[in-house]
Amino acid sequence: MSKSKSSESVKVVVRCRPMNEKERVANFNRVVSVDVKLGQVAVCNPRGASSHEHPKVFTFDSVYDWNSKQMELYDETFRPLVDSVLFGFNGTIFAYGQTGTGKTYTMEGVRNDPERRGVIPNSFEHIFTHISRSQNQQYLVRASYLEIYQEEIRDLLSKDQARRLELKERPDTGVYVKDLSSFVTKSVREIEHVMNVGNQNRSVGATNMNEHSSRSHAIFVITIECSELGPDGENHIRVGKLNLVDLAGSERQTKTGAQGERLKEATKINLSLSALGNVISALVDGRSTHIPYRDSKLTRLLQDSLGGNARTVMVANIGPASYNVEETLTTLRYANRAKNIKNKPRVNEDPKDALLREFQEEIARLKEQLEKRSGRKRRRRRRRRVGEGGEEFEDGEDEEDDDDDDEDEEEGVDADKNIADYWHEQQEKLEKERRAIMEDHSLVAEEKQRLLKEKERKMTDLHKEKEASEMLTAKVKAMESKLLVGGKNIVDHTNEQQKVLELKRQEIAEQKRREREMKQEMECRDEETLELKETYSSLQQEVDIKTKKLKKLFSKLQSVKSEIQDAQDEHVKYRQELEQTQNELTRELKLKHLIIENFIPMEEKNKIVTRATFDEEDDLWKMTPITRIQNSDHQMMKRPVSAVGYRRPLSQHARMAMLMRPDVRYKAENILLLELDLPSRTTKDYEGPVIAPKVAAALEDALREEDEIQVDASGFHASLGSSPGLSASAAGFSKKPKSGRPKTGKKVSTPTSAHSPLSGSGSPLYPQSRGLVPK
């Protein structure tokens, strides 16, 4: 398989499912008969039974009836394709047919049952079993999973399911999906986990014909990179890509009862499948100069698989019931056309974007860093030897050189153990030195503290170096674990037995294929040899044989006429659909032209027409951006400036109006002048505390200003010395009553006269102090 043929045809197989319970209850007849040995499928038209219409017969590479087993289908049809992918070819397996005919069962099957597992899980086992049995080869296996839902590409392995991906194309790699996530897998369990995660995100719905109908086209991509040492001593990398495609089934709204969202999904599904049929027809028709790959994202992704660099197997799934005879015939006709598609597969050797090469270079770089670290530590280890007394001394150069070979041999036997022993020895050494410093009482406290800090720093550095080395070692092991190498952890005897069994199965499948081809060839040559060998003993025998041959030829003639009539009917139907589409597009185009001619100026129309360009990458018409380049055909004119600071030309009247009134009509800028909308007051005036009226009156009286009181006490002391009673009475006379001041508020003064006993010469008397509260 190292070299491919110049071209090879797409391999087409047909699988017919058994009658389901609904079809049995509805008493539908079985109209499909399958001849497994001859590779033929015959379909009887139930409406043509009365007119004795002959069944339509189709011949394929291989056919499988309702009694076929999953493993039988895989060994005979798909195993050679997966083997070619392991040798560096691109391969594609896709299931095609009406909804509810068993496409998903063929591709996925029942995972927990080994006998009913589909193509995808069987291919997983096949790939990793082949890798485990390989010798002197390194493999890297990556998996991606995407779906095309309503003509939008979604990554089923991404956390953000709302994100839509874009299709890109490069001359060296062809069509690819930008930013599609890819996961490196090391075993069947890991790749099955990737598949299960994607299946949980896939769009599935229920219809009248299928309770678990796929509402999107799903493509599971396995990329296998293999590195092998060539005769020139260099590593050569082969990259094979396996596309496992589970197409959504074509459906009719009258049968599925699709409504609302299901109807929209069915419309998009039928459009993409119709585009796939057009691509198949264009590839088969030698007169077609254009292949409409860009009509659908599905056909763009399958561009290499249909007429490109790939080996392709198409599984056409059909139903046996008379209820679906039209869909069955359509599927068989498309499959019959696909047999004539020619692909040109080639081995993908030493691609530029091989991830395996990057892994190998990164592993080599990390190992080099690790060897430098371990080499530096080994040199330190050889340079310093600790004596019995705890003193360090250096060895001679000759002794160091003598030890190199021994240590290298030991490291070759068990490098990891030596590195671990080295770290343990260094740690014990530092701990021993730290304890010696702690027990040495002759050192000064400051010197002891300095030495302890230095040992702690060395211990920290040692831990950091150890962690860095462990991190590098773990990284190398993790990257090496992703590179799969065969011949490990396998019992050789069991391995050889499995190889022999697989070779026997492949030989049996190849023998069946050759037998089927020989029978088909014998069937074709029977007619030619029959005429040469025929000898007649009588005229009656000759008449009987010729009559039998005539009937056979007449039945073939009727079959060919029926095929021609069906082809004409299909052509007429397709032509009517094209005419209807053309009429709708013409009507819409006339409406657009009418709007443009009546509402858009001719200059603006010409500008738009000259700027419009078709983007083949996105399959859309786009407008080229306007630039300020002087020599450009689409030069953008600058705005006329009437004055500095204004973006628009203004008249004198407009300028005066701007100054006189705040009107937005004459504003030069798109700015409105609005008054400030002040908020409501957030503070209050100060209000003093409320005081009772009596208290307020008392305070007012106490704080009122009073006139000065003059008292003549000249005779008070003279009389005070002669009569004590008089002095007492005089004292009582001059004393204010305790009742307080009168309510009138008038000031009361003590009357004085010359005859008063208080008047007279002596020391002056002063009034007593008065307060609010009597003493």
From Swiss-Prot:
Annotated S-S bridges: none
Highest taxon in the source lineage: Eukaryota
Molecular function GO labels: ATP binding; ATP hydrolysis activity; microtubule binding; microtubule motor activity
Any Pfam family hit: Kinesin
GO cellular component: cilium; cytoplasm; dendritic spine; kinesin complex; microtubule
Binding site for ATP: G97, Q98, T99, G100, T101, G102, K103, T104
Phenotypic effect of disruption: Loss of function of Kif3b only results in ciliogenesis defects in a subset of cilia. Robust cilia are still present in the central nervous system. Mutant have rapid rod degeneration and delayed outer segment genesis, but cones appear normal. The mild phenotype of kif3b mutants may be related to the presence of the kif3c protein.
Quaternary assembly: Heterodimer of KIF3A and KIF3B. KIF3A/KIF3B heterodimer interacts with KIFAP3 forming a heterotrimeric (KIF3A/KIF3B/KIFAP3) complex.
Name recorded for this polypeptide: Kinesin-like protein KIF3B
Organism: Danio rerio
Gene name per UniProt: kif3b
